[in-house]
C-alpha cells in the first residue's frame, strides 16, 4: 500500500515537473516572441540605409514595380549630382577633355537641371551621351588622381557605367539601382521583419552631425547595435566640415556610442563596409598617408585589421564586439553576414530575457 502511494506521489511529482518545464518553455517562447530592437548607427554615407534596403529585399519580398518606379527621380538626381561633381572638379583643377570636341558636353552638364520638370518626365538622353563621352575620355585618369580633393558619391562609377540604360525613355530602376541610390536619411526610419523565430524592429538613424541629437529616445532596451563604418572613407573629409577626416569622425562617433551609459549591456555588431571600394583605393591612396602608424602597405586584410584595431582601442567599456567585412550593395554578401548576425542577436535576446 505504502509502495503504491509512493509510486503515485512520484508520478504526480513528475507530472508537475513536466508541466513546469512546459510553462517555462512557453514563457521563454513568449519572451523571444517580443521584438528585438536593433539600432543602426554610423556616420553619414556609411551604408546604413543600404542595409535597410537589403532587409526589404531579403526578408520582405523586395520592391514592387511601383516602388521601383518611384525611385526614378532619385536615380536621376544622383546621376546629375555625380556628373556635376565631375565637371566642377574639372574646372577646379583646370582639367580639359583630351578630345576638344567634348568641351560643349562639360558646359551642357554644368547647366542642365531637372528642377521644375513634371514628376514623370524622363531625363534628356543627351545627358547620357555627354556623361559616357567624358567618362571614357583620358582626362578621367587625371581627375581620379585627385579624387581625395573633391566629393564624389561612391555610386558615381556605377551610374556612369549604366547611364544609357538610365536615360532611356522607358527606364524603370532595378533593385541594384535602388541599392546604389542615395537619399540623405533625416530623422528615424523604422522597419520590421522576421528573421527565423526573431521579430526584428530596426531603426535607421540619420548619420549627419545635425541628426545625432535625435537618437537618444531610441536607446532604451536595445538588443544589439549595428554600427556601420565605410572603410573607403579613410582618405575622405566630411560633407559638413571639410577639415575633418571621415574615418576619424567615425571613430569619435563609435567612441561616444560604445562607452555610453545607455549601452552597458549591449553588444555591438561592427560592419566594416564598402570593402570593395576600399580594396580599389588602397593602391592609389595609401592608408599610411592618413594613419602614419600603419605599415601594412596596400594589403586589404592588413589594412582592415588595422582599422578594426583602431575601433577596438576606443572600446573602453569592453563591450562584446562582432566585426564583419561587408559590401552593403551585394545582396549575397549581406545574406551571408546576416546569417551570422542572427546568432548574435538571438544570443543577446536570450540574455535580455533571462533565458541565458
Curated annotation (Swiss-Prot):
Provide the residue positions that the database annotates as binding Mg(2+): 49, 185
Cellular component terms per the entry's GO annotation:
cytoplasm; heterotrimeric G-protein complex
Q: List the residue ranges of the region (G4 motif).
A: 269-276
Kindly give the InterPro entries that the UniProt entry links to this protein: Fungi_Gprotein_alpha, Gprotein_alpha_su, GproteinA_insert, P-loop_NTPase
MF (Gene Ontology): G protein-coupled receptor binding; G-protein beta/gamma-subunit complex binding; GTP binding; GTPase activity; metal ion binding
- From the UniProt entry, list the residue stretches annotated as the region G3 motif: 200-209
- Stretch forming the signal peptide: none
Lipid-binding residues (covalent, S-palmitoyl cysteine):
4
**Keyword match NADP:** no
Question: Per the database record, which ranges form the G-alpha domain?
Answer: 34-356
Name its GO BP terms in alphabetical order.
adenylate cyclase-activating G protein-coupled receptor signaling pathway; conidium formation; sporulation resulting in formation of a cellular spore
The annotated region (G5 motif) lies at 326-331
**Lipid attachment points (N-myristoyl glycine):** 2
Alphabetically sorted, this entry's keywords are: Conidiation, GTP-binding, Lipoprotein, Magnesium, Metal-binding, Myristate, Nucleotide-binding, Palmitate, Sporulation, Transducer
What does this gene product do?
Answer: Guanine nucleotide-binding proteins (G proteins) are involved as modulators or transducers in various transmembrane signaling systems. Involved in conidiation.
Family stated for the protein in its record: Belongs to the G-alpha family. G(q) subfamily.
UniProt-recorded name of the protein: Guanine nucleotide-binding protein alpha-3 subunit
Q: Which species? A: Neurospora crassa (strain ATCC 24698 / 74-OR23-1A / CBS 708.71 / DSM 1257 / FGSC 987)
Q: Which gene encodes it?
A: gna-3
